[in-house]
Amino acid sequence: FTFEKGKHYGLVGVNGAGKTTLAKLLLDLYKPTNGRIYDGTEKKTALFQDFQVYPVTVREYLLMGNDSNLSNARVSEVLDMLECSNLKQGLDTPLTLLTEEGTLLSKGQLQRLAIARAFLSEADFILLDEPTASLDPISEREVYRLSEHIFQEKTTLFITHRLGAVSQMDEILVLDHGQLVEHGCHEELMRKNGVYRKLYQTQTEMYVDEI
């Protein structure tokens, strides 16, 4: 499979299908035992669901690994987009859960901050593994909508178990037992009686039952 520049991809599958393993292969954290991965990108960044919080300021956290000299205005703009406006006045406040002087944020707020760091990244390829796991469905939809605008010229791979969140992606990759079994846009995959359609219908039925 080839990732094309400027396209947005979704990677889905049940738990244990191999999504996170594939992510770590793409980031060169694992080495393939068979086959090859050809990497033509100069800069990559990733946001995993188990992101870390470090004893640094909000500004330092947002610009971690970012060599560009971003203005406070740009940082504030992204924080506004992700409903983190309350942090704009405290960019130099220590961000940590380990000290009394730190800024105490909820898990959802911390996840928004981690997403903001990805939004500010200058990388060519951005991988996001369950980036909205701590957000409600409405907030999740908004994050994916914003990502289409912010990542216009970048290649992105969103890994999620919530299929509704990736229905607007350019292409969706479906893993099953460690194998890429289907790929295509949402409409194409729904026309097939395959893994994706069954997963999507199951999730839709579960959502209706909860309502």
Where are these regions (language model features)?
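The feature captures the beta-strand-to-loop junction immediately N-terminal to the Walker
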Residues: V12-V14
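ABC-fold ATPase nucleotide-binding domain signature/coupling loops
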Residues: Y54, C84-L113, P131, M206-I211
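Catalytic Walker B motif of ABC-type/P-loop ATPase nucleotide-binding domains
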Residues: I126-E130
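A short, proline-enriched helix->beta-strand linker immediately N-terminal to the Walker B motif
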Residues: G102, L120-D124, E153
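C-terminal portion of ABC ATPase nucleotide-binding domains
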Residues: R145, S167-I211
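Conserved "ABC signature" C-loop
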Residues: F51-T99, E122, V195
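Helix-to-loop junction immediately C-terminal to a conserved catalytic motif
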Residues: L27
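Conserved catalytic loops of ABC-family nucleotide-binding domains
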Residues: H149-F158, V166
